[in-house]
């Protein structure tokens, strides 16, 4: 592993342990050259995914880009970072276990929106506004209407015969 401080390849693992849900290995490392300490995370990757962009271009799937876009939608929201990490891991697992090596950016966006809807309504609306390219206030109203209808649906009492 290359040291992020001096770029030396001579590093040692000092501590290695799984995270709470055992889906990631956290490793504490130290650079032998400059003594810089840093942490790395190791995840299982089920398959190499390629994203088909809207313009038809194909690019490798980037988990970090997914995490950044989710974090942007959650900016200034009080959501536990561990819940965000678990959500992103669940999205990646869903994509990797889908059976396809190529996935459209639209499909990724829809999956992210499903997960954000369960995590935080404001983040869901923020993400939807960028993903669906909102142009007018009525676009926001439509999404807010969907959320309101969804919130009210479980409150309806079941019909008994």
Curated annotation (Swiss-Prot):
Cofactor: Zn(2+)
Sequence intervals crossing the membrane: none
InterPro entries reported in the protein's UniProt record: ATP-cone_dom, NrdR-like_N, RNR_NrdR-like
Region of interest called Disordered, as start-end residue ranges on this chain: 1-20
PROSITE patterns referenced in this protein's UniProt entry, alphabetically: ATP_CONE (PS51161)
Record keyword Nucleotide-binding present: yes
Ranges in a coiled coil: none
GO biological process: one example: negative regulation of DNA-templated transcription
Family (UniProt): Belongs to the NrdR family.
Protein name (record): Transcriptional repressor NrdR
Gene: nrdR
């Amino acid at each position: 592993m290359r040291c992020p401080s001096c770029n030396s390849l001579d590093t040692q693992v000092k501590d290695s342990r799984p995270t709470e849900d055992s889906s990631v290995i956290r490793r504490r490392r130290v650079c032998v050259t400059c003594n810089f300490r840093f942490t790395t995370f190791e995840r299982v990757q089920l398959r190499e995914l390629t994203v088909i962009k809207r313009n038809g271009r194909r690019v490798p799937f980037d988990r970090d880009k997914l995490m950044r876009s989710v974090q942007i939608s959650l900016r200034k929201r009080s959501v536990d970072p561990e819940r965000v990490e678990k959500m992103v891991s669940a999205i990646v697992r869903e994509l990797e276990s889908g059976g396809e090596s190529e996935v459209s950016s639209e499909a990724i966006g829809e999956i992210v929106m499903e997960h954000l809807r369960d995590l935080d309504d404001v983040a869901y609306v923020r993400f939807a506004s960028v993903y669906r390219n909102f142009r007018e206030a009525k676009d926001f109203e439509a999404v807010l209407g969907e959320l309101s209808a969804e919130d009210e649906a479980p409150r309806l009492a079941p019909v008994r015969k």
